[in-house]
Regions:
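Short, acidic/charged, Gly/Pro-enriched secondary-structure junctions
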Residues: 152-182
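Short structured motifs
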Residues: 125-129, 188-189
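Oligomerization/assembly interface segments of phage tail-like spikes and tubes
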Residues: 129-150, 197-212
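Small/polar beta-strand repeat architecture
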Residues: 2-10, 17-32, 38-41, 54-126
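Short coil-to-beta transition motif at edge beta-strands of beta-rich domains
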Residues: 38-54, 161-167
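Short acidic, glycine-rich loop/turn motifs
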Residues: 15-17, 51-55, 170-176
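Well-ordered beta-strand positions in beta-sheet-rich domains
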Residues: 48, 60-62, 70, 178-184, ...
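Short beta-strand and beta-hairpin "edge-sheet" elements
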Residues: 170-215
Length: 216
């Protein structure tokens, strides 16, 4: 089987700009698949939705499938260790609104998440024993041509100064699916220019929770 590769050109990157009006959630299943039921939700396959009023299940999740009022979340969304909510009185679902594609990007660099290390050495240990600790989420560095007067780059500055946590989405080429997550601008837009060149800029988005991959 030939090696599969994923070209950079043709990738799409979006930032969340808001949410649709929240719709009432009337049911949730936690196993075998994570699903929610909401009449008139308006979500479609590939959307990123925000759940509120569901306690430990609150958060942003990609949509894998839609059947009438039933929304099935991505396979990576694992709720099997959670309890279904006892009440849906305040439960809502809203769909993320996206910016236009950030076409000025020339490089995307994602730092992987890392696991901390816990020392579990005891007096019976023959040496130092460790186990996996807490996850520290990585970051995404975007490098792009500097144009602070454009709507996209103005929004980056706004998000930084507002200390906003926002959704992001990257759609890959060659049927490799999409990545979804949330984060905040850790480093505001920098800039660099020189003679016979063009200004370049970049930002660092610190991930606030795990990301999710939704296959094509």
């Amino acid at each position: 089987m030939p090696t599969q590769t994923t070209p950079f050109q043709g990738t799409k990157f979006y930032l969340g700009t808001g949410l649709t009006e929240g719709k009432t959630v009337t049911a949730v299943t936690v196993k075998p698949n994570a699903t929610i039921t909401s009449a008139g939700h308006g979500a479609k396959v590939g959307d990123f939705i925000k759940l509120t009023g569901l306690g430990a299940l609150d958060g942003y999740y990609p949509v894998k499938a839609v059947t009438n009022d039933l929304i099935t979340l991505a396979d990576e969304v694992d709720w099997t260790s959670q309890d279904a909510p006892a009440s849906y009185a305040a439960a809502k679902v809203a769909t993320v609104k996206w910016s236009s594609n950030f076409c000025a990007i020339k490089q995307i660099e994602g730092d992987g998440d890392t696991l901390g290390e816990e020392d579990i050495t005891t007096m019976c240990s023959e040496g130092t024993e460790t186990e996996a600790g807490e996850i520290e989420y990585g970051s995404i560095k975007l490098t792009f041509f500097y144009a602070p007067g454009t709507a996209m780059q103005a929004d980056l500055r706004k998000k930084f100064h507002a200390k906003e946590t926002f959704p992001w989405m990257m759609i890959l080429k060659n049927s490799q699916g999409s990545l979804y997550g949330t984060g905040f601008i850790q480093t505001s837009p920098n800039f660099s220019g020189e003679v016979k060149g063009k200004f370049e800029s970049g930002v660092t988005i610190k991930k606030t929770k795990r990301d999710y991959h939704l296959p094509a």
